[in-house]
From Swiss-Prot:
Result of knocking out the encoding gene: Mice die shortly after birth and show caudal truncation and severe skeletal malformations. Lack of segmentation and impaired segment polarity of the paraxial mesoderm are the primary defects. Mutants show altered expression of MEOX1, Pax1, and DLL1 and lack of expression of Notch1, Notch2, and FGFR1. Mice lacking Mesp1 and Mesp2 die around 9.5 dpc. The major defect is the apparent lack of any mesodermal layer between endoderm and ectoderm and a defect in the migratory activity of mesodermal cells.
Disulfide bonding pattern of the chain: none
Transmembrane feature ranges: none
Gene: Mesp2
GO CC annotation: nucleoplasm; nucleus
The protein's name in its UniProt record: Mesoderm posterior protein 2
Keywords assigned by UniProt, alphabetized: Developmental protein, DNA-binding, Notch signaling pathway, Nucleus, Phosphoprotein, Transcription, Transcription regulation
Induction text: Down-regulated in NOTCH1, DLL1, RBPJ and FOXC1/FOXC2 mutant mice. Expression in the anterior presomitic mesoderm is periodic, dissipating once the segmental border is established. Negatively regulated by RIPPLY2. Positively regulated by TBX6 and Notch signaling.
Tree of life domain: Eukaryota
Annotated stretches, region: Disordered: 51-89, 231-265, 325-350
């Protein structure tokens, strides 16, 4: 009654009309059972594939994230870390070596030999020992301050009380050999040359150096008299300076700074008398040959008038002044020769001769030598 069913491998594969001996109902049932078996066979595939379809984009994003380059922090290199540790070890070795060298210089009274000292103890003992040595040698701050104060007091006590700048007497020993020679000659020196000392009134100063040329500068320090002023005082006691026609062969120069020289007599007294008489002197009395003559810086000129064949020599000063002595001040007034001033004609006016023009002065016949 029951018929054998076809093998399952043939179910659903054989068409309905090819199965001989089967009715229509059995053929439909067989066909339906084959479809069910086919569906059940492929069910795991559909069950696993349907949920995986919406997860496809997530899987793609995961793959892109895995393939994309990540920004990772660079790990510290092993060489740099090792070099930093080596530098630290080297620094500690150098510090330990320096402290050991410092402990060698500490005396046993400060640091016993068998005692181990830490770094801080070594530094404290070294500071204490250095302070003790500075106090013994006088190099501490208090000792140096006392020494400076003592030297300042000593310098202030050796200052010259009369000198406003506070110069010390040792400066006088460094002024040169001239100062030493003056001191050995017996001249009294009250203070160094930079110190003028107490001032003296002009009246007293004039009494001390009387009969001296007024152009001479008075001495700077009244307690010091140089050989120049002593020679001037000796020259003041001698006879006053005489005019050129009465001078001997050796005369003193009218300038106190000039040295002695030969002053020769140039012309005869008669010729000089004619020259002096020919000069025009206004209401003041004429020059007397007997009175002494003081001519500062005379310059000699040779005057050769046209009528006379022989040359005449005379002394002519640009600012010649005749100063009388202190004895004749009341009797004879000072005679002042006129100074040649430029006139519109630029000539030299003399009383006994016509006006001399510039062409005559420059020409060869006049022969005027300055």
């Amino acid at each position: 009654m029951a018929q054998s069913s076809p093998p399952q491998s043939l179910q659903g594969l054989v068409p309905l009309g090819l199965l001989p001996g089967l009715g229509l109902g059995s053929a439909i049932g067989l066909h339906v059972s084959g479809l069910v078996l086919r569906f059940v066979r492929f069910l795991p595939f559909y069950a696993t594939r349907r949920p995986s379809q919406p997860a496809g984009p997530a899987r793609s994003t995961r793959t892109t994230q895995a393939t994309a380059p990540r920004r990772t922090r660079p790990a510290p290199a092993g060489g740099q870390r090792q070099s930093a540790s080596e530098r630290e070890k080297l620094r500690m070795r150098t510090l330990a070596r320096a402290l050991q060298e410092l402990r060698r210089f500490l005396p046993p009274s400060v640091a016993p030999a068998g005692q181990s000292l830490t770094k801080i103890e070594t530094l404290r003992l070294a500071i204490r020992y250095i302070g003790h040595l500075s106090a013994l040698l006088g190099l501490s701050e208090d000792s140096l301050r006392r020494r400076r104060r003592r030297s300042a007091d000593a310098a202030f006590s050796h200052r010259c009380p009369q000198c406003p700048d506070g110069g010390s007497p040792s400066q006088a020993q460094m002024l040169g050999p001239s100062l030493g020679s003056a001191m050995s000659s017996g001249v009294s020196w009250g203070c160094p040359p930079a110190c003028p000392g107490p001032l003296i009134s002009p009246e007293n100063l004039g009494n001390r150096i009387s009969n001296v040329d007024p152009r001479v500068t008075p001495p700077y320090c009244p307690q010091i008299q140089s050989p120049l002023h002593q020679s001037l005082e000796r020259a003041a006691d001698s006879s006053p300076w005489a005019p050129p026609q009465a001078c001997p062969g050796m005369q003193m120069s009218p300038e106190p700074r000039n040295k002695t020289g030969h002053w020769t007599q140039s012309t005869e007294p008669a010729e000089l008398t004619k020259v002096y008489q020919s000069l025009s002197v206004s209401p003041e009395p004429r020059l007397s040959l007997g009175s002494p003559l003081l001519l500062p810086r005379p310059s000699c000129q040779r005057l050769q008038p046209q009528p006379q064949p022989q040359p005449q020599w005379g002394c002519w000063g640009h600012d010649a002044e005749v100063l009388s002595t202190s004895e004749d001040q009341g009797s004879s007034p000072a005679l002042q020769l006129p100074v040649a001033s430029p006139t519109p004609s630029s000539g030299l006016q003399l009383s006994g001769c016509p006006e001399l023009w510039q062409e005559d002065l420059e020409g060869p016949p006049l022969n005027i030598f300055y």
